[in-house]
C-alpha cells in the first residue's frame, strides 16, 4: 500500500501531517501561516487561513506541473509578395488561438499568477499529426478555416504555424494564496469553510478536482477549472442556495452535502461528468428537532454528521442514485467534527480531549464501522525535547551490556508490544527541564540526573538486579508492560564517558547525537508528554485499508517516552547488518558440519514418495468436457542422488480404467489458467507446446490448486536442478493473467548454428502480479502493474501460491493490483422509437464484449478469475478510442464499424462502454516504487564485460500522464534508484526504450517516433529530441532498442526495423517491414529479437499470445530470416534485455578468418 498522509490543524492554527508509514505528526514545511481548517487530497491540500483567505498546498514531486500555451501565426498568399501577414478583412487575426476567434499575440500571453514561471521562450512546433513538417512548421490550406496539410499545393492560399511555450508551477511545498481576477465588486466574501472532492466523478480527466467554499454570509462558491495541470483554478462561481450555509462537504464522487444555520442539511443533486456543479438542492431534516446538524462529511456512499449536542450520526441508504439517503442512525461517541476520507474511512476529533480518532471496522459491507480508536502519535518536534542524558542510559539496558547503572538488569524476555488507549489528562506526566548545575553533580556511575522525572524514567525502564518485575508505577494510568525492542549494533559505551550535563554536553560525534537532545523551549504550548489538542482533521488524501492498518494505535508501554523515541529512530538499514552477519555465520557453520561427512554413503540410496488427490481433467477427445480424475505424483531418488518425478492421471472411459503419465523433467511450464468458474492450470511439454494443446487440470478450491502448483513446480525445478532466485541473465515474461515467469537462458539459445528450440525452454513462475516487466543483466528488474504502479525486484523468489520450500523466507512482500473489466451496451436506431436495445436478428448481443460475439451483462459478468474481487460499481468509460458524447455513446453506421463520438445522419447503431474495477491481493519478491504511476519503463541492456558496468544503470520511463522520466541512482545495491529526473517533451509519450549504447528511442501517443540525442552517463537526460518519421500511413505504439538494432511496432501489429543506423547518424534512414501478427517486441543486448505473436497455429489448436524468437539474426543480417515458436496461449509480454549470454564459438567459426567490417556493421559503443 503506498504511503499517504493525514492532515490536521491544532488549536494554535498549525498544520501537521501524519504518514501511514510513520508514527509522528510532522509540521507542515511552510508553517508561517495559521489555519482554521484544511481539506486534503492525495496531491494537494486546500485550506482557509486565519485571514479568511484560501490557500493551496501542492506537494512536491519529481514530475513538474507544466501547462502549454499555444498561439497560431496566420498568413495569406498574394500575387505580389507571396505569403505575408496582410490578411483580408474577413480573415481571422494574424495571431490567434486555434479557432481564430481570439486575438492572441505572443507578447500578450501572460502568466496567470505569480506562482508560475516560464520554462523557455516561444518556439515553433514542427510536429503535425505525428509527422514532422518542413523547416518552419507551416501547414497549408485553401482558406480559413479548412483542412490543413504539411505539404504546399498549387491552391494553398493560406498557411499557419503553431507557436508553443510551457509554463511551470513553482509554488510547491508552500501555501500559495489563490489569486482572483474577478471583478472586485463580485469577489466572494471572506470564506468560512471549504471542501475538496470530485476526483472520482465518472471518468473525469485525471487530476480534476471540485472545490467548494462557503463565505461568512452563507453563500456557496465553486472554483472553476481546478485540475492537476491547473492547481489554482481560474475563477469563483456563485451558486444559489435556499438558505444561509454554514459548512459544506464534497465527496470523491458525486455527493455534496451542506449544513444550514437552522440545522438542516442541503443535498446537491445532478452532479455528473458534464455538470460537476450539479443542478438543484434538496433539504434533509436533522435527526432531531431540538439539535440541528452542526457539521457534516460525505464520502463515496456514506454521510456522517455531528449535531449541536456533539452526537455523531450516520446516514443510511446513501448512494449516487439516492444522494439524500433514507434515515439517521445514532453512533456511539461525542465529536466536535468528523471527516470521511478515502475508502469511506472516517476520522473525528473528540469533544472532551481534542484527540484525533479513527473509526475502526469500516468495510464495504459495514460502512458504519464498529468503534472509535484514538491515534497515539506524538509530534515530530517532541522528539527533540524528550531526550536527556538519563534517557540515554535508561535506553542502554535494552540494547546490550555496554551501559550499566548501579541497579540495572536485562529486560524480560516476555516483552511484547501492547495496544493501549491514550492516557487521560490525569495520567500525563509533564517532563521537567533538566537543570545544568544539578546535572553536573549527578551520579557519574549511573549517569542519572537529579531531576525526579529522570529517576522515574530509569526505575520504570530498568528493573533492579536479579528481579524480573518492574517497580510498580506510582502514577495513575494503565499498567506498563515490557516492550519488544529491535536489535541494534549501535554502541552506547560512549555515553558512559560523558557527564550528564545538558544536551549541549554531548559531543556531536556520539552515535546518538542525531536524537537532538535540546532543553524545552518556552514557546511550546504543550508539555513533553502532553498530547496536542486538535481543531480539524482531513483524511481526503489518506488511504487506510483494513488488511494493512498503520502503526498509529500501538505504543510500547514499558518504555519511557525518550526510550520509545530512541527505539523508533533505529532504521531498518541499521538492523539489517546483524541479520546478514548471523546468516553468514550460520551458512559457514552448515558448510563446516556437512563437508566432513560427504564421503559417507547414504543410509537409504533410493526413496519413493507419492502424493495423491482428486482433480478434474479436460478430456482431449469427445465429449470434450471436464472429467473427474485421480492424480498421483510419484517422486523417487536415483543412485546419483537426483530426484525425479512422474505424474499419473487416472480416468475412466466407458467403465474402463485408463491413465496417462507425464515425466516432470519434460514439463516446460505450469501455467494458471484464466477461468471465471474453476481453479485450473495447464501443463506444457515440448510436444504439447508445438500442438498448442496443454494438459489442463482443475482443483475444487483455490488452496488445492495452489498446493498442486507449488508441489509440481518444486518437483520440476528439482528435476532440472533449478533453485533459488533467477540469474541476472534470465528471460522474464508475463501472461495475460498477470502471472510472472522466468527462464534461464541456455548458451545455445542465441547460437547461429543449431540454436536451442524455444519450445524446450523451461519456464518457472514467480510470485506477484504485473502487466509488464523489464530486466537488466546486472540483476535490476522493474515491473508495472495494471494500475500503473511501479515495482522493483527484491532478489527473492516464490511468494503468491509458492510458500514454504518453494519460496524464499525473506524479500517477499504483499502486492496488490487493480484492473478494469469492460463490457459494451449496444443499441440500434429505428424510425419509431429511436435508439433502443432491440436489434436485428443478425446483430450482436445488446450487452456484449468488445467483439460482440460473447454476451456480457452487468449481472452476469464476473471478475477475471476467482482471485479477483470487485471494488467498484459499474461506470461509463469515456476514455475509449474514437471519443464519446456526453453520455458516453459512440456511433457508427453498423456493427462492426469505425466508431466516433458524434452522431451523423448515417449512424444507425451506437455503443457505450461500461467498466468496473476489481482488485487482487497477492505476495511476491516486489517492492513498490512510489509515488509516480508509470506506463512504460526501459533499462539499458548491458553485457557483463561492458565498459559502462561501473556506472549507474540508466533507466527511463513514461508516466501514466505521458511525461518522460529518467531514474537516477539505480545500481545493483539500490535497484529502486533515488529520484526521478523529468525530461521535457512537447506532447505525451506512450513508449520508450534505451539501447546498449545509450541511444534513447520513444513513441508519442500520436504514433510519432523520437530519438533523444547526447545521452551519456555524465549527461543522463540528453539534450534534445529528434522527430523521426513513422512508417507510411502507420501509427507506432512501441519501440525497442538493442545494441545496434531498433525495432518498432505499429497499431496494426506490423513489426518494423530501422535501417541505416551508424555511429555518425544514430537516427537511421528508413523503416523496413519485417513481419505482421506481432503484439510485443523485445530487443536484447546481443540484438536478439523476441516477440509475442498474436495468433500461432499449432497441430491441434490455435493459440493467442505466443513467445517467438527471431532466427538467423547476425551482424550482417540484423533482421534475421525466420521465427521459432515457443510457449504460447495467453502470453502478453516478454523481456530478453537481460540475456547477454553469447553462444560458444564453433570450430568452423574459430578457423574462419574474421571478415572485414562493412559499412552496415554494428555500431561501436
Swiss-Prot record:
Residues 1143-1153 have a biased composition (Low complexity). It comes from the Eukaryota. The modification Phosphoserine is found at residues 386, 388, 391, 412, 417, 938, 949. Pfam families: Hyd_WA, Pex24p, Tectonin. TECPR repeats lie at residues 209-240, 254-285, 301-332, 344-376, 729-756, 953-984, 998-1029, 1044-1075, 1087-1127. InterPro entries: Beta-propeller_rpt_TECPR, Peroxin/Ferlin, PH-like_dom_sf, TECPR1-like_DysF, Tectonin_beta-propeller. Keywords: Autophagy, Cytoplasmic vesicle, Lipid-binding, Lysosome, Membrane, Phosphoprotein, Repeat. It is found in: Cytoplasmic vesicle, Autophagosome membrane; Lysosome membrane. Residues 611-717 form the PH domain. Signal peptide: none annotated. Its main location: membrane. One of its GO terms (cellular component) is nucleoplasm. One of its GO terms (molecular function) is phosphatidylinositol-3-phosphate binding. GO terms for biological process: autophagosome maturation; autophagy; macroautophagy; regulation of autophagosome maturation. Residues 404-486, 1140-1165 are annotated as: Disordered. Interacts with ATG5; the interaction is direct. Interacts with WIPI2. Interacts with the ATG5-ATG12 conjugate, the interaction is however mutually exclusive with ATG16, since it does not interact with ATG12-ATG5-ATG16 complex. PANTHER family: DYSFERLIN-RELATED, TECTONIN BETA-PROPELLER REPEAT-CONTAINING PROTEIN 1. The PH domain mediates the binding to phosphatidylinositol-3-phosphate (PtdIns(3)P). While full-length protein is unable to bind PtdIns(3)P in vitro, it is assumed that the binding to the ATG5-ATG12 conjugate exposes the PH domain, allowing the association with PtdIns(3)P. Tethering factor involved in autophagy. Involved in autophagosome maturation by promoting the autophagosome fusion with lysosomes: acts by associating with both the ATG5-ATG12 conjugate and phosphatidylinositol-3-phosphate (PtdIns(3)P) present at the surface of autophagosomes. Also involved in selective autophagy against bacterial pathogens, by being required for phagophore/preautophagosomal structure biogenesis and maturation. Belongs to the TECPR1 family. This is Tectonin beta-propeller repeat-containing protein 1. It comes from Homo sapiens. The gene is TECPR1.
Amino acid at each position: 500500500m503506498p504511503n499517504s498522509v493525514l492532515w490536521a490543524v491544532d488549536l494554535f492554527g498549525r498544520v501537521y501531517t501524519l504518514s501511514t508509514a510513520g508514527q509522528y505528526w510532522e509540521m507542515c514545511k511552510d508553517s508561517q501561516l495559521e489555519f482554521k481548517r484544511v481539506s486534503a487530497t492525495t496531491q494537494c491540500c486546500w485550506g482557509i487561513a486565519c485571514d479568511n483567505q484560501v490557500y493551496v498546498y501542492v506537494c512536491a514531486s519529481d514530475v513538474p506541473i507544466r501547462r502549454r500555451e499555444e498561439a497560431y501565426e496566420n498568413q495569406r498568399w498574394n500575387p505580389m509578395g507571396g505569403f505575408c501577414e496582410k490578411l483580408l478583412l474577413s480573415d481571422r487575426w494574424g495571431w490567434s488561438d486555434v479557432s481564430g476567434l481570439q486575438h492572441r499575440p505572443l507578447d500578450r500571453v501572460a502568466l496567470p499568477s505569480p506562482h508560475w514561471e516560464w520554462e523557455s521562450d516561444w518556439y515553433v512546433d514542427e510536429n503535425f499529426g505525428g509527422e514532422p513538417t518542413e523547416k518552419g512548421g507551416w501547414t497549408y490550406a485553401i482558406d480559413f478555416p479548412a483542412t490543413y496539410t504539411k505539404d504546399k499545393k498549387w491552391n494553398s492560399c493560406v498557411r499557419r504555424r503553431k507557436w508553443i511555450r510551457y509554463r511551470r508551477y513553482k509554488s510547491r511545498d508552500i501555501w500559495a494564496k489563490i489569486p482572483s481576477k474577478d471583478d472586485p465588486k463580485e469577489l466572494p466574501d471572506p470564506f468560512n469553510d471549504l471542501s475538496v472532492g470530485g476526483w472520482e466523478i465518472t471518468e473525469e480527466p485525471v487530476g480534476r478536482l471540485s472545490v467548494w467554499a462557503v463565505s461568512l454570509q452563507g453563500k456557496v462558491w465553486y472554483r472553476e477549472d481546478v485540475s492537476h495541470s491547473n492547481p489554482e483554478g481560474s475563477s469563483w462561481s456563485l451558486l444559489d442556495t435556499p438558505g444561509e450555509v454554514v459548512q459544506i462537504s464534497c465527496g470523491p464522487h458525486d455527493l455534496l452535502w451542506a449544513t444550514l444555520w437552522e440545522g438542516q442539511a442541503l443535498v446537491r443533486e445532478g452532479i455528473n461528468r458534464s455538470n460537476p456543479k450539479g443542478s438543484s438542492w434538496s433539504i434533509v431534516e436533522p435527526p432531531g428537532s431540538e439539535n440541528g446538524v452542526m457539521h457534516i462529511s460525505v464520502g463515496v456512499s456514506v454521510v456522517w454528521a455531528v449535531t449541536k449536542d456533539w452526537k455523531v450520526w450516520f446516514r443510511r441508504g446513501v448512494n449516487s442514485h439516492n444522494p439524500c439517503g433514507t434515515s439517521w442512525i445514532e453512533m456511539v461517541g461525542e465529536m466536535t467534527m468528523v471527516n470521511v476520507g478515502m475508502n469511506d474511512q472516517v476520522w473525528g476529533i473528540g469533544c472532551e480531549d481534542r484527540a484525533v480518532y479513527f473509526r475502526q471496522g469500516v468495510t464495504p459491507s459495514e460502512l458504519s464501522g464498529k468503534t472509535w480508536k484514538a491515534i497515539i502519535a506524538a509530534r515530530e518536534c517532541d522528539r527533540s525535547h524528550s531526550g536527556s542524558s538519563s534517557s540515554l542510559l535508561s535506553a542502554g539496558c535494552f540494547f546490550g551490556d555496554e551501559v550499566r547503572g548501579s541497579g540495572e538488569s536485562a529486560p524480560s524476555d516476555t516483552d511484547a508490544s501492547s495496544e493501549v488507549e491514550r492516557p487521560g489528562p490525569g495520567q500525563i506526566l509533564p517532563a521537567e527541564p533538566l537543570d545544568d548545575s544539578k546535572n553536573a553533580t549527578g551520579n557519574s556511575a549511573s549517569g542519572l540526573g537529579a531531576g525526579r522525572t529522570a529517576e522515574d524514567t530509569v526505575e520504570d525502564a530498568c528493573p533492579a538486579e536479579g528481579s524480573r518485575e518492574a517497580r510498580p508505577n506510582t502514577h495513575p494510568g494503565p499498567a506498563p508492560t515490557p516492550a519488544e525492542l529491535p536489535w541494534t549494533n549501535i554502541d552506547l559505551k560512549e555515553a558512559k564517558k560523558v557527564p550528564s550535563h545538558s544536551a549541549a554536553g554531548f559531543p556531536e560525534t556520539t552515535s546518538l547525537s542525531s536524537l537532538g537532545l535540546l532543553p524545552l523551549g518556552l514557546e511550546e504550548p504543550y508539555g513533553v508528554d502532553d498530547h496536542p489538542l486538535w481543531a480539524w482533521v482531513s483524511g481526503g488524501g489518506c488511504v487506510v485499508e483494513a488488511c494493512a492498518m498503520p502503526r498509529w494505535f500501538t505504543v510500547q508501554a514499558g518504555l519511557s517516552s525518550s526510550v520509545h523515541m530512541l527505539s523508533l529512530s533505529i532504521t531498518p538499514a541499521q538492523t539489517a547488518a546483524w541479520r546478514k552477519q548471523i546468516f553468514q555465520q550460520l551458512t559457514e557453520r552448515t558448510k563446516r558440519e556437512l563437508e566432513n561427512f560427504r564421503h559417507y554413503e547414504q543410509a537409504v540410496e533410493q526413496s519413493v514418495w507419492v502424493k495423491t488427490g482428486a482433480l478434474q481433467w479436460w478430456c482431449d477427445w469427445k465429449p470434450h468436457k471436464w472429467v473427474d480424475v485421480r492424480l498421483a505424483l510419484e517422486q523417487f531418488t536415483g543412485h546419483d542422488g537426483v530426484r525425479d518425478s512422474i505424474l499419473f492421471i487416472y480416468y475412466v472411459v466407458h467403465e474402463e480404467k485408463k491413465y496417462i503419465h507425464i515425466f516432470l523433467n519434460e514439463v516446460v511450464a505450469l501455467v494458471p489458467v484464466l477461468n471465471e468458474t474453476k481453479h485450473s492450470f495447464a501443463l506444457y511439454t515440448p510436444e504439447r507446446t508445438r500442438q498448442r494443446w496443454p494438459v489442463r487440470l482443475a482443483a475444487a478450491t483455490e488452496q488445492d490448486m495452489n498446493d498442486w502448483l507449488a508441489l509440481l513446480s518444486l518437483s520440476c525445478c528439482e528435476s532440472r536442478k533449478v533453485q533459488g532466485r533467477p540469474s541476472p541473465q534470465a528471460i522474464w515474461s508475463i501472461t495475460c493473467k498477470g502471472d510472472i515467469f522466468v527462464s534461464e537462458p541456455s548458451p545455445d539459445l542465441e547460437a547461429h548454428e543449431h540454436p536451442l528450440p524455444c519450445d524446450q525452454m523451461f519456464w518457472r513462475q514467480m510470485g506477484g502480479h504485473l502487466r509488464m516487466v523489464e530486466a537488466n543483466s546486472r540483476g535490476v528488474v522493474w515491473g508495472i502493474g495494471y494500475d500503473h504502479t511501479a515495482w522493483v525486484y527484491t532478489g527473492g523468489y516464490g511468494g503468491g501460491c509458492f510458500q514454504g520450500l518453494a519460496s524464499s523466507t525473506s524479500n517477499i512482500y504483499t502486492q496488490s493490483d487493480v484492473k478494469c473489466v469492460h463490457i459494451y451496451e449496444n443499441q440500434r436506431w429505428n424510425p419509431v422509437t429511436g435508439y433502443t436495445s432491440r436489434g436485428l436478428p443478425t446483430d450482436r448481443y445488446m450487452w456484449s464484449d468488445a467483439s460482440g460475439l460473447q454476451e456480457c451483462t452487468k449481472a452476469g459478468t464476473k471478475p477475471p478469475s476467482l482471485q479477483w474481487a470487485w471494488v467498484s460499481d459499474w461506470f461509463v468509460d469515456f476514455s475509449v478510442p474514437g471519443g464519446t458524447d456526453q453520455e458516453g455513446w459512440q456511433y457508427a453506421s453498423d456493427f462492426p464499424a469505425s466508431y466516433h463520438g458524434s452522431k451523423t445522419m448515417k449512424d444507425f447503431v451506437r455503443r457505450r462502454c461500461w467498466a468496473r474495477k476489481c482488485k487482487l491481493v497477492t505476495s511476491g519478491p516486489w517492492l513498490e516504487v512510489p509515488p509516480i504511476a508509470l506506463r512504460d519503463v526501459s533499462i539499458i541492456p548491458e553485457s557483463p564485460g561492458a565498459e559502462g558496468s561501473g556506472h549507474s544503470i540508466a533507466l527511463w520511463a513514461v508516466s501514466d500522464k505521458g511525461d518522460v522520466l529518467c531514474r537516477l541512482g539505480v545500481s545493483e545495491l539500490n535497484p529502486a534508484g533515488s529520484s526521478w529526473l523529468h525530461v521535457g517533451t512537447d506532447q505525451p509519450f506512450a513508449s520508450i526504450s534505451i539501447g546498449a549504447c545509450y541511444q534513447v528511442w520513444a513513441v508519442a501517443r500520436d504514433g510519432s517516433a523520437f530519438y533523444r540525442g547526447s545521452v551519456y552517463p555524465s549527461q543522463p537526460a540528453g539534450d534534445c529530441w529528434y522527430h523521426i518519421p513513422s512508417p507510411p500511413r502507420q501509427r507506432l505504439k512501441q519501440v525497442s532498442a538493442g545494441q545496434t538494432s531498433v525495432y518498432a511496432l505499429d497499431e496494426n501489429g506490423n513489426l518494423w526495423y530501422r535501417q541505416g543506423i551508424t555511429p555518425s547518424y544514430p537516427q537511421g534512414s528508413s523503416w523496413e517491414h519485417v513481419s505482421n501478427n506481432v503484439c510485443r517486441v523485445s530487443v536484447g543486448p546481443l540484438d536478439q529479437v523476441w516477440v509475442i505473436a498474436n495468433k500461432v497455429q499449432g497441430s491441434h489448436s490455435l493459440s493467442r499470445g505466443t513467445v517467438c524468437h527471431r532466427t538467423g539474426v547476425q551482424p550482417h543480417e540484423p533482421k534475421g530470416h525466420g521465427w521459432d515458436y515457443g510457449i504460447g496461449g495467453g502470453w502478453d509480454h516478454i523481456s530478453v534485455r537481460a540475456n547477454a549470454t553469447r553462444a560458444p564459438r564453433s570450430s568452423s567459426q574459430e578457423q574462419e578468418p574474421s571478415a572485414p567490417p562493412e559499412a552496415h556493421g554494428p555500431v561501436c559503443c
